[in-house]
């Protein structure tokens, strides 16, 4: 009997079995954030006997990763405008409050974020133009 008559992979059935490594669900989805951890969190905090699908965890992870990248990009631009290399809570505050959609989404108070600079127009001094009369 030859080795091919039996079922299974055997020695010649698998081509380089070392290259078949298991991939994480984050790697399969092409994400940096941990899909498994998000799924575990969803399952733990689901109400009652709610079932959580794997695609729900992947979708939520992708949304969280996108929002984080968006906020970090805007905060990085704010830090670059101020000519510093480190993003601080102040830069996060300026980035979030400067974007209308992020401002409506994130209504939280950012610690050490400060406030946005704003002066009411009624408080500004009126400057008269000289030489306008003829």
UniProtKB/Swiss-Prot annotation:
N-acetylserine carried by residues? 2
Q: Does the keyword DNA-binding apply?
A: yes
Which terms are listed as keywords in the entry?
Acetylation, Activator, Chromatin regulator, Chromosome, DNA-binding, Nucleosome core, Nucleus, Transcription, Transcription regulation
* Name of the protein this chain belongs to: Histone H2A.Z
- Whose protein is this, by species? Saccharomyces cerevisiae (strain ATCC 204508 / S288c)
Q: Quote the gene name from the UniProt entry.
A: HTZ1
Q: Which SUPFAM superfamilies match?
A: Histone-fold (SSF47113)
Subunit note: The nucleosome is a histone octamer containing two molecules each of H2A, H2B, H3 and H4 assembled in one H3-H4 heterotetramer and two H2A-H2B heterodimers. The octamer wraps approximately 147 bp of DNA. H2A or its variant H2A.Z forms a heterodimer with H2B. H2A.Z associates with the VPS72/SWC2 subunit of the SWR1 chromatin remodeling complex. Also interacts with RBP1/DNA-directed RNA polymerase II largest subunit. Interacts with NAP1. Interacts with MPS3.
Post-translational modification (record): Acetylated by ESA1, a component of the NuA4 histone acetyltransferase (HAT) complex, and/or by GCN5, a component of the SAGA complex, to form H2A.ZK3Ac, H2A.ZK8Ac, H2A.ZK10Ac and H2A.ZK14Ac once deposited into chromatin. Acetylation is required for function at telomeres. H2A.ZK14Ac is acetylated at the promoters of active genes.
Protein family (similarity comment): Belongs to the histone H2A family.
- MF terms (GO), sorted A to Z: chromatin binding; chromatin DNA binding; identical protein binding; protein heterodimerization activity; RNA polymerase II cis-regulatory region sequence-specific DNA binding; structural constituent of chromatin
Record GO biological process? chromatin organization; chromatin remodeling; heterochromatin formation; nuclear-transcribed mRNA catabolic process, non-stop decay; regulation of DNA-templated transcription; regulation of transcription by RNA polymerase II; silent mating-type cassette heterochromatin formation; transcription elongation by RNA polymerase II
**Gene Ontology CC, one term:** nucleus
Region ranges (Disordered): 1-31
Q: What domain of life does the native source organism fall in?
A: Eukaryota
Under the heading Pfam families, the entry gives: Histone, Histone_H2A_C
Annotated region Interaction with VPS72: the residues are: 98-108
- Low complexity bias (residue ranges): 15-31
Under the heading SMART domains, the entry gives: H2A
Indicate the transmembrane segments per the record. Answer: none
Q: Which PROSITE patterns does the UniProt record give?
A: HISTONE_H2A (PS00046)
